[in-house]
Amino acid sequence: MKRVALLVQYDGSHYSGWQKQKNATTVQEILDRALLKITNHTVQTFAAGRTDAGVHASGQVVHCDVDCVVPGNSYSDVLNSLLPSSIRILESIEVKDSWHACYSALYRHYRYVINNSKFPNLFIDNWSWHRYQKVLDEVLMLNASRQMIGEHDFFAFQKTGSNRTNSITKIKNIDIKRVEDLIFVDIKATGFLYGMVRLIIGQLVLVGENKISPEIFTDRWVNKKKNDVKESAPAKGLCFVNAVYEENVFKKINNNDFFPVFIIKGFS
């Protein structure tokens, strides 16, 4: 038996999230099915982050224990021959039995993309939220978000249905940048609550549109005013960029930010 780490990309548009569910197609289900074909035994996969329905991943990290003669670094090629084109394995490698995709991660990185153009763009529609009621003030959004850095109770930014015992987590960094009509919101945290990023984005957009002030934004999450946090950004604009570990287990790829380059270039 050996433990194999997988670096996984997927377009979440037609999946009901990462985790297996009854009567729904998920990324984990499809991946486990492919692993069964290779190993001839049931394989349990563990991911660094459990993305919700419609959310993408450009550098999801997964591990599994397999009893098979296939070398660890060959699983990427073999799996890609079995998986649909919406799921790709960028790299695979054998790791120590003590290494865990979820529990060994120092933090996770999510990115949200807002298309703030007056006009929709068909070619990035599946990976961004077209929101234009006015030009967003990304500087105001960034300033409002800065107070969230650190360990706090983010109860206001947790959707109903979470099984967590508490809503405390630590945000390491938040960055908001505009590239022409596209706004990129990058959030790095030790862990994320259910629906957390999309609820944060929904509120920050209201700040950027001057519909609520930065002070109201802060008051809502600091004082746990969950009933005032009603707007959730669409899933399609959210992407799990990567998970960061004490040691980068993937040897071929040093830079784990695999976000689509064509989006970063914006419109010409």
From Swiss-Prot:
First-tier enzyme category under EC: isomerase
SUPFAM superfamilies xrefs: Pseudouridine synthase (SSF55120)
GO molecular function term, any single one: tRNA pseudouridine(38-40) synthase activity
Domain of life per record: Bacteria
Record field: catalytic activity: uridine(38/39/40) in tRNA = pseudouridine(38/39/40) in tRNA
Keyword tRNA processing: yes
Keyword tRNA processing on entry: yes
Active site: 52
GO BP field: tRNA pseudouridine synthesis
Binding site for substrate: 110
EC number annotated for this UniProt entry: 5.4.99.12
InterPro entries noted in UniProt: PsdUridine_synth_cat_dom_sf (IPR020103), PsdUridine_synth_TruA (IPR001406), PsdUridine_synth_TruA_a/b_dom (IPR020097), PsdUridine_synth_TruA_C (IPR020095), TruA/RsuA/RluB/E/F_N (IPR020094)
Entry keywords, A to Z: Isomerase, tRNA processing
Matching Pfam families: PseudoU_synth_1
Record's subunit section: Homodimer.
Family matches, as NCBIfam families: hisT_truA (TIGR00071)
Family to which the UniProt record says this protein belongs: Belongs to the tRNA pseudouridine synthase TruA family.
UniProt function note: Formation of pseudouridine at positions 38, 39 and 40 in the anticodon stem and loop of transfer RNAs.
Protein name, UniProt field: tRNA pseudouridine synthase A
Organism: Prochlorococcus marinus (strain MIT 9301)
